[in-house]
């Protein structure tokens, strides 16, 4: 399966490495050329030597998305640090390029529901943390 991940921060690079290890074709797009170092970190071979692709560019630019392989992507993951950017690029992937499996990292839990209504799969670390803390505060059932 061809996976395109936008954002090579902690989350994006970890998911990219995991997907490549699982045997998927993986392309990562990030505007910071130094973010490539996260993909190489802790590996015996470079990201490219391991079969990964890295493209420097802004995901809001169609040319960068095409260079990164969006036209053949079966899964699209938007994992930049910005909720607005993630929503826009996820909708581009979904509506313009017809990708059905679009996953979006959403920091603001209030937005996650709306994103879901747009047909996007949302992952909200903040919402997950809130739920975990709330469970920790519930009295144990006897």
Feature locations, PLM:
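Cytosolic regulatory regions of ion transport systems
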Residues: 1-142
């Amino acid at each position: 399966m061809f996976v395109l991940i936008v954002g090579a921060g902690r989350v994006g690079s970890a998911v990219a490495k995991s997907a490549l290890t699982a045997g998927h074709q993986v392309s990562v797009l990030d505007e910071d050329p130094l973010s490539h170092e996260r993909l190489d970190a802790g590996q015996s071979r470079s990201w490219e030597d391991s079969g990964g692709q890295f493209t420097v560019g802004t995901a809001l630019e169609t040319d960068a998305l095409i260079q990164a392989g969006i036209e053949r992507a079966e899964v699209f993951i938007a994992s930049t640090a910005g909720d607005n950017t993630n929503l826009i690029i996820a909708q581009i992937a979904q509506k313009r390029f017809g990708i059905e499996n679009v996953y979006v990292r959403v920091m603001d839990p209030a937005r996650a529901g709306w994103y879901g209504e747009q047909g996007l799969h949302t992952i909200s670390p903040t919402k997950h943390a809130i739920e975990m803390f709330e469970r920790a505060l519930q009295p144990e059932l006897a």
